[in-house]
From Swiss-Prot:
Subcellular location(s) of the protein: Membrane
Residues binding ATP, per UniProt: 104-112, 127
Residues holding Ca(2+) 1: 413, 415, 417, 419, 424
Domain EF-hand: 400-435, 436-471, 472-507, 512-542
Name recorded for this polypeptide: Calcium-dependent protein kinase 19
Disordered, as annotated region: 12-46
The species this protein was found in: Arabidopsis thaliana (Mouse-ear cress)
Region called Autoinhibitory domain, residue ranges: 363-393
UniProt remark on domains: There are 3 contiguous domains conserved in the CDPK subfamily: a kinase domain, an autoinhibitory (junction) domain and a calmodulin-like domain. The autoinhibitory domain (363-393) inactivates kinase activity under calcium-free conditions.
Lipid attachment points (N-myristoyl glycine): 2
């Protein structure tokens, strides 16, 4: 079977939502109801955490001037001290044991690097979590529990191995097995052909992880393709491994779980009803299987609120292409994994016993419609180039276009530092009449914080709110296009796109190819002005931020 040619112009019945993590943002321990969900969001670091230590009470009688000055100096030093260790042991300098290398990726709480063990020369992955971004006590508890669960599950074949955890004054560092093969989505979209059999192999590994977790008394609570990595670049020997146990919990007998966690497209209906158990992991795996077979999630909308409404409605499409050509056995498994009633939903053992998923089972080698691959490639990163374009336009809007937003920024930036912290954003939104929850405010800050430093600077604020000022105006779009078209050729070449994106650490070679594939409608290998405008105008409302939309 040869490589399939992906027809990017082929019309599909509904728009392809972005579930790559750019618009489908991970929801960490959200304390909100489905009706209160914010609009599309992008994962980004959390708010700046300011540590305040209460001053010591002065003893009676009052000290002499010299003693008083010593006490004041001691108080100043106390305010600079960090909170008590999260791991409950003395701080360690990780650089004494490991040398940190290039960045592998960024998440809500920190950055993952490649690191080398000094004593052995072996490479590992180091997930460095910035403690100032752990705003709530619950955030700190989640980190402790993540480490406990990873140690507890250590040695299981389809789970990323943790080597150790270290803590210094600024960060908690998790040193883990290095998975050099990349994310599950990359494996799917790179294949020369894609079949039901390939989908069965992938979902079998996913459900084996679920089975191990449930057998050992753990609910993952955030299963999605981005949280599965390939152990090596050699496809023949590579294993699929689960990672990111940041919202996972130990199963407690008789406990009803109520907090809404996970990622929008993969959330089970009982999570939204705040009454769930381990069956939610099977639902999430069922969503992954649905995507593997057709390229779209079973429940989609332009906003998280809309997605949740579709999930609660529970109607699954098996009529649109390519479902008529998918085997009945595959559809039967999907239906049983996505049973609305968790009591009727398959267990992990039942899934693995299904004839379609078993090794040597009914899953066919027949290639799935190439449009599925095309859609799945679109799920990866479409907004990367658009994000840079918005930033450029924000930097170049006229003064009169920015007056209102400039005043709003100044009013929120109460300490006149030139940046807005979490507390300033929360206070400013309350003054505007906003009724957003604490979690939603944090998410807004993360969405706008492009450089990941935990605060919003002026340009980031304008980028997040400026669509009210007609960002799609022709002159702004043309200037943005010229900014990327360095040689004035009338096209944005692959090299020009690569230069622009790598300047902001916003994309690797695969990502750049995918953006060109998606935007380049005439398939000439570059992006012309009309293609650029079409990209900027598509789903433009999804960029709108609640920063300027009080409820």
């Amino acid at each position: 079977m040869g490589c399939l040619c992906i027809n990017l112009k082929k019309k599909v019945k509904k728009p392809t939502p972005d579930i790559s993590g750019e618009q489908n943002t991970e929801v960490k321990s959200r304390e909100i109801t489905p009706k209160e969900q914010p609009r599309q969001r992008q994962p980004a670091p959390r708010a700046k955490f300011q540590i305040v230590v209460q001053p010591h009470k002065l003893p009676l009688p009052l000290p002499q001037p010299q003693e008083k000055q010593k006490l004041i100096n001691h108080q100043k030093q106390s305010t600079l001290q960090q909170p008590e260790p999260i791991l409950g042991r003395p701080f360690e300098d990780i650089k004494e044991k490991y040398s940190l290398g290039r960045e592998l990726g960024r998440g809500q709480f920190g950055i993952t690097y490649i690191c080398t063990e000094i004593s052995s020369g072996k490479n590992f992955a180091c997930k460095s979590i910035l403690k100032r971004k752990l705003i709530r006590t619950k955030d700190r508890e989640d980190v402790r529990r993540e480490i406990q669960i990873m140690h507890y599950l250590s040695g299981q074949p389809n789970i990323v191995e943790i080597k150790g955890a270290y803590e210094d004054r600024q960060s908690v560092h998790l040193v883990m097995e290095l998975c050099e093969g990349g994310e599950l989505f990359d494996k799917i979209t790179k294949r020369g052909h894609y079949s039901e059999k390939a989908a069965a192999e992938i979902i079998r590994s996913v459900v084996k992880v679920v089975q191990i977790c449930h057998f050992m008394g753990v609910i993952h609570r955030d299963l999605k393709p981005e949280n599965f990595l390939l152990s090596s670049k050699d496809e023949a020997s590579s294993m699929l491994k689960a990672t990111d146990f940041g919202v996972s919990v130990f199963i407690e007998e008789g406990k009803v779980y109520e907090d809404i966690v996970g990622s929008a497209y993969y959330v089970a209906p009982e999570v939204l009803k705040r009454n769930y158990g381990k069956a939610i992991d099977i639902w999430s795996a069922g969503v992954i299987l649905y995507i593997l077979l057709c390229g779209n999630p079973p429940f989609w909308a332009e906003t998280d609120k809309g997605i949740f409404e579709e999930i609660l409605r529970g109607e699954i499409d098996f009529e649109s292409e390519p479902w008529p050509s998918i085997s009945e056995s595959a559809k039967d498994l999907v239906r049983n994994m996505l049973k609305y009633d968790p009591k009727k939903r398959f267990t992990a053992a039942q899934v693995l016993e299904h004839p379609w998923i078993r090794e040597g089972g009914e899953a066919s080698d027949k290639p799935i419609d190439s449009a599925v691959l095309s859609r799945m490639k679109q799920l990866r990163a479409m907004n990367k180039l658009k994000k840079l374009a918005f930033k450029f336009i924000a930097q170049n809007l006229k003064e009169e276009e920015l007056k209102g937003l400039k005043t709003m920024f100044a009013n929120m930036d109460t300490d006149k530092s030139g940046t807005i912290t979490y507390d300033e954003l929360k206070s400013g939104l309350e003054k505007l009449g906003s009724r957003l929850t604490e979690t939603e405010v944090k998410q807004l800050l993360e969405d706008a914080d492009v450089d990941g430093n935990g605060t919003i600077d002026y340009i980031e604020f304008i980028s997040a709110t400026m669509n009210r000022f007609r960002v799609e105006r022709e002159d702004n779009l043309f200037k943005a296009f010229q900014h990327f078209d360095k040689d004035n050729s009338g096209f944005i070449s692959r090299q020009e796109l690569e230069t622009a994106m790598k300047e902001y650490n916003m994309g690797d070679d695969i990502m750049i190819k995918e953006i060109i594939s998606e935007v380049d409608a005439d398939n000439d290998g570059s992006i012309n002005y009309q293609e650029f405008c079409n990209m900027m105008k598509s789903c433009s409302q999804s960029h709108q931020s609640k920063l300027v939309q009080p409820n």
